[in-house]
Each structure stands twice: as C-alpha cells, then as structure tokens.
Amino acid sequence: MTGERSIFWQPWQGQGMEHLRLTYHEDHVVARGDVQGIAALAPFRLRYKIKCDLGWRTRKLDIELYELHGCRELHVKADGQGNWREEELGPLSELAGCLDVDISATPFTNTLALRRLNLQPGENAALNIAYLKVPELTFHPASQRYSCNWRAPTGAIVTYEDCSAASRPTWRSMPTGW
C-alpha cells in the first residue's frame, strides 16, 4: 500500500496544534509531524520524522526543536529489536528492549504501538517504550498499557494507560481507521 494522509490535532487543554503527514511506501512508513505549543510559558515548535518498517517498529527518529534561544536536534536509530543509538552519543543502553518511541508532545506516537500490536476486543498489552520528553529532549524507558475496548469498521476504541506516570496532554480530533 502506498499513499499519503494528512491529519491535524489540537490539545484539549492549553495552546497548540499538530499537523501530521503519514506516508506509506512499499517497504516502510514515514510520519512527519509539526507541533507548535507552549511549555513552561515559552513557545516551541517541534518537527519530527519517524521512519518505521512495515511492522510499525521505529527504525529512525529525527527531531528538530525550535525554542526562543535556538534550535536543538536529535537523531536516533533503532534496529527494531529494542536497541537504540543516538547519532552523537552512541548506544542508548537505558532504552534496551523498548520497541516503540513515545514523544510527549504528540498523540501520534501511541499509534505506533497500536498498529504493531493490532489488539482485538478484550485484549490488552503492557510494554516498555522509549519516552521522549519535550521540550527537554530527554529519553527514559516507561511502561504503558493498551486495551482494545471494541472495534468498529472505521477503527478501534482503545484505552491508553501510562503506568509510569509520565504525564501528557489529552488531544482532540484523533482520527480513526488507519
């Protein structure tokens, strides 16, 4: 399957907006997101690009974070087996075993685990993820649980629980049927 989809999100609380472009290729999927928001009373713009294999495992993550004092970048590769490497720092051993990335500033990254798991009604899964906190741009492993409540032709209703208490905003206009 090839093609492209464009999606917009807005947080329920606070100020912000995200534009996501999801592009399906023959052998991989690319998500490009542009998030604008406010953190600690300061505006920021986060641009990310995530390349996944067809099993929705993160293989490459590129981040650009624009703040009042300039731009910071982060470039990470993953082997799809739970090993992560930052371009300048080398191996990120604290993330060993994490297959999915979750960027705090976007709801999209929860989709990666959902697509990979393909939960059916009544099923749930607990997993460890590589959590990227924005605007700090710091990684740490976190535990999350996903439960599929029911499935409709256009998508599924899924409950997301952050078992490690790393908080994130709640977003509206989340699309279904991917």
Where do the language-model regions lie?
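Hydrophobic/aromatic-rich structural module bridging two neighboring secondary-structure elements via a short loop
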Residues: A40-E88
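Short solvent-exposed loop/turn micro-motifs enriched in small/polar/acidic residues
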Residues: G14-Q15, A42-R45, H69, F139-P141, ...
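Solvent-exposed helix/loop surface patches that form functional interfaces
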Residues: T2-H19, Y24, L74-T159
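Hydrophobic residues positioned within well-ordered beta-strands of beta-sheet architectures
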Residues: A31, L46-I50, L61, V158, ...
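Short N-terminal edge-element motif at the start of the domain
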Residues: M1-G55
